[in-house]
Amino acid sequence: MATPLKLYRNIGIAAHVDAGKTTTTERVLYYTGMSHKIGEVHDGAATMDWMVQEQERGITITSAATTCYWSGMDKQFESHRINIIDTPGHVDFMIEVERSLRVLDGAVVVFDSVAGVEPQSETVWRQANKYGVPRIVFVNKMDRMGANFLRVVSQIKQRLGSTPVVLQLPIGAEEEFKGVIDLIKMKAIHWDEENKGMTFKYVDIPADLKATCEEYRAHIIEAAAEYSEELMEKYLEGEEFTEAEIKKALRHLTITNKVVPVFCGSAFKNKGVQAVLDGVIEYLPSPTDIPDIQGVDEHGDEIHRKTSYDEPFSALAFKIATDPFVGTLTYFRAYSGILKSGDTVYNSVKGKKERIGRLLQMHANSREEIKEVRAGDIAAAVGLKTVTTGDTLCDQDKVVILERMDFPDPVIAVAVEPKTKADQEKMGIALGKLAQEDPSFRVHTDEESGQTIIQGMGELHLEIIVDRMKREFNVEANVGKPQVAYRETLKQAVEQEGKFVRQSGGRGQYGHVWLKIEPQEPGKGYEFINAIVGGVIPKEYIPAVDKGIQEQMQNGVIAGYPVVDVKVTLFDGSFHEVDSSEMALKIAGSQCFKQGALKAKPVLLEPIMSVEVVTPEDYMGDVMGDLNRRRGLVQGMEDSPAGKIVRAEVPLAEMFGYSTDLRSATQGRATYTMEFCKYAEAPTNIAEAIIKKQ
């Protein structure tokens, strides 16, 4: 029986590392009846964390998508279908969070009642603002030492600049935490410890909390009154609002991102999660509540698709995963129309057709095969060939490109070498698959050393990649230290003679050239000019001279790094009828270039990165001081809602370990991005140290 669209909820559960997000998701699956034994994260058995690395590290890396059904704590609703995307909270995996927010309609943000609004939560909040995702908040871990519900509420106001509306107050805190008060019903809720909170009862509000409850209920009424003129009139005349009126008003205000309803509880102690599920149904949007999806057609004109089964099919692929049993899985969100297995769809970003074979609905890591996917749903397709993250799948005759997701460039690189010859080919396949899954991870072969270089978003990111390579593909690899790619260039023009002569009985070797070597402007590259007149060196030998010069340039002249941006003119020389050969002239060219380059003031160039740091104002001085210590040149500053933005140019060599240092200097509240800017001459003392190493 297909669920009507208005009964769908596509939500994400997002939070900072350790706020208890995975435990919350586990409880959701338990109460909605999808999982019969509660998986605890600290046992390494949580259903949503299905990669071995996640269970070992106790953090969530891949966002698994899960479907469950809920009809309310009091069975007061029709059965709603909730699709949940679990998102990671570690900064090296921000990309996963961004991907999942893109395809959600709403989110539950989990905060730790002790730690409050942590840096990562600020980042998640900013991303949710960027995509306009309505959200409700669950203040978790109310049973922990130092739990302080109202402090978290004030941080949501101050740090995140949002308008929280408190719908529940805790009864007690720390080990005294008993349950919650529903401020709309004005009843206390006690969950039954015996059956893990499956049953509960409403009781009267404890006398000592009555006054506080009245005060917070008044805030709810005040917020609800903003919804319509009728309610405002009722409010001004001092009339009571009905429960239905309050909920309708709050639903509208939440979906339009004007308020954020706040719930509290302890997922671990089985208190409060069912009320959050009710909140998902009551306050978060169904696919029909969100604006029509926008895109462009093949001519680049803007078009809209309604969330309806009657529209042409369109969907966005938001995650590619390799599954040990079925191969490549493409997770996608259907925005319009209906897709049946066996259909052919068009990947409008790549311009390729794809036939849809099996369609799966995922429950954490068990799967159910389905015949069709309808608008508003989230599912996975098996074995698509051309699709990567952010691609659009659509009807062949009604082409649409939904917006692309932008992914940052990787900032750190390390060399990986297979431990054995047998691992060589396997490693190539494994890295290719992992790069397809994760757009923020890249692989290339260094032409100079022949090494395989992997690049990613941070040191943890690459550790996990190497770890997955070992576990999922059985490839053992040695990992090098993070590396910087230097270059060399020349600063002065010289003329140089080069001779290569060998006589040892029989045929000798003879090569003789004159080269003019000059610097070019940065980025111009290598240029070779043949200015030989009167055939002093025959035409057929000229390419050999050029080749000799280029080989020497690749090997460098001072530190073994490639020489860039030079112009070489071959203007004179001589040859011997018998002894001259291509080989002899190549060696003459190569030696001549090296001797000349050493006189042409060779210098070392280092890559400079454009770095942008977003930091709360309090840490501004520390951040600037640290950038100066790293030989950074501050280019400018500006204000943003998240604090100050500092832009600087910093040598890549000074940026290793920066994310860790920045996190500790700002208690993790600052974030940064960096990308390649240019090559610039390295200061003498730095260059000397590098040359010595060689």
UniProtKB/Swiss-Prot annotation:
InterPro entries: EFG_II, EFG_III, EFG_III/V, EFG_IV, EFG_V, EFG_V-like, EFTu-like_2, G_TR_CS. Pfam families: EFG_C, EFG_III, EFG_IV, GTP_EFTU, GTP_EFTU_D2. GO terms for cellular component: cytoplasm. It is found in: Cytoplasm. GO terms for molecular function: GTP binding; GTPase activity; guanosine tetraphosphate binding; translation elongation factor activity. Gene3D superfamilies: 3.30.230.10, 3.30.70.240, Elongation Factor G (Translational Gtpase), domain 3, P-loop containing nucleotide triphosphate hydrolases, Translation factors. CDD domains: EF-G, EFG_III, EFG_mtEFG1_IV, EFG_mtEFG_C, EFG_mtEFG_II. GTP binds at residues 15-22, 86-90, 140-143. One of its GO terms (biological process) is ribosome disassembly. The keyword Oxidoreductase does not apply. Keywords: Cytoplasm, Elongation factor, GTP-binding, Nucleotide-binding, Protein biosynthesis. Catalyzes the GTP-dependent ribosomal translocation step during translation elongation. During this step, the ribosome changes from the pre-translocational (PRE) to the post-translocational (POST) state as the newly formed A-site-bound peptidyl-tRNA and P-site-bound deacylated tRNA move to the P and E sites, respectively. Catalyzes the coordinated movement of the two tRNA molecules, the mRNA and conformational changes in the ribosome. This is Elongation factor G. It comes from Legionella pneumophila (strain Corby). The gene is fusA.
